[in-house]
Amino acid sequence: MRLDQLLKHFSYESVQGSHDLIITDICYHSGKVKRGSLFVCIKGQYTDGHDYIMDAVKTGAFAVVVDESCMVNVRWECFIYTEHGKVRVHELVRNYGMAVIGVKDTRQALAQISAAFYDYPAKKLKIIGITGTKGKTTTAFLTAGILKEAGYKTGMVGTIWTYNGKDVKKAGHTTPESSDLQRELAQMVSNGCVCCV
């Protein structure tokens, strides 16, 4: 998907660099970046994605989404300040041909970008959410089983694993990050699921 198309689906404060880039993946972990990725810098409990911008650049990211509060303009030059020092935005744009997008909330931007990138898969599924203190997994399995018996191909997202209508995958986190969830929902749609529990 072209970056200029993605830009229509989320709020941003600034964009420096080309809008014509073809984005092939959305990543929030620098170790998963490949050529063509859009890397979203997420501040976590222990690490900050802004500290890994250059790692993402070196492994092929075409664009980076940063927290606007990390960007500082000094004498006609813009820097992204990280724990490891500063990164010159101009160098990312000029030397690497990247786009740098400043947003107020990178986590919210990741959710909006991912939904658009995967063509809003949640809108194509009947989503059944289960909350509570005890019995969620049992209730999810029973619900999915009832739907299956009724003829509805059903995917599942759980704390231990996900099922996309074809394959079972171990869950990376008890609560998936928005881009991971959108990717799984898109796979469910691709595999013919009509429901997700």
Language-model segments: residues:
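Phosphate-binding loop of NTP-binding sites
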Residues: G102, Q108-V197
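N-terminal leader/targeting and accessory segments in enzymes
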Residues: M1-Q112
